[in-house]
Regions:
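Phosphate/oxyanion-binding active-site loops and adjacent basic polyanion-contact surfaces
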Residues: 28-31, 69-70, 110
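Low-complexity, glycine/alanine/valine/leucine- and proline-rich hydrophobic stretches
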Residues: 79-83
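Alpha-helical elements of Rossmann-like donor-binding domains used by nucleotide-donor carbohydrate transfer enzymes
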Residues: 34-37, 75-76, 109, 113
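Conserved alpha/beta-hydrolase "acid-adjacent" motif
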Residues: 66-76
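Conserved strand-to-loop "acid loop" that flanks and positions the catalytic carboxylate
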Residues: 59-67
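Short strand->helix junction
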Residues: 24, 66-67, 100-101
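Catalytic active-site module of serine/aspartate enzymes centered on a nucleophile-bearing elbow/loop
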Residues: 84, 88-138
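Alpha/beta-hydrolase
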Residues: 1-60
Length: 138
């Protein structure tokens, strides 16, 4: 076991994380301040209200992610977006996955879900708009 087990069930990913000096460091005071500022802004009511109602959103999360409070935090954010009028939201929880679903044992499922979701959004954008025919002068 490692203090980094919250990241992924994949031992190789955790080992790489532990040995990477760009991942395994203590934030500076400025780093903590910037992270705190970002979290405050990201969770502000205005952020949700300003989000375009037609913006498609995809949330992927592990149901064993302590950072997302085991799904509770993700559900809270999704409900805030829905409450602000955002309509096209899809949420996928991966069973037993932890924080980094793209670096988890089931990462291929997550990549497939992203691909499917992107294709569905592109298909929706490509559908012809229903335009009213304009009379032409003769």
């Amino acid at each position: 076991h490692s203090i980094f087990d919250w990241i992924s069930r994949d031992r190789d990913v955790v080992s790489l994380y532990q040995s990477d000096e760009k991942c395994n460091f203590i934030f500076t005071a400025t780093g903590f301040r910037d992270l705190y500022t970002l979290l405050i802004k990201a969770n502000a009511v205005q952020t949700f209200r300003r989000t375009p109602h037609d913006l498609p959103l995809l949330f992927l999360a592990g149901d064993k992610d302590p950072v997302g409070r085991y799904g509770e935090g993700v559900r809270r954010v999704v409900n805030l977006y829905r409450g602000a009028g955002v309509k096209n939201i899809e949420v996928i929880f991966y069973k037993d996955a932890r924080h980094e679903v793209l670096n988890e044992l089931g990462r291929l499922d997550a990549f497939a879900d992203i691909s499917r979701w992107l294709e569905s959004q592109l298909t929706a954008c490509a559908e012809p708009a229903h335009e009213t025919a304009q009379p032409t002068a003769t």
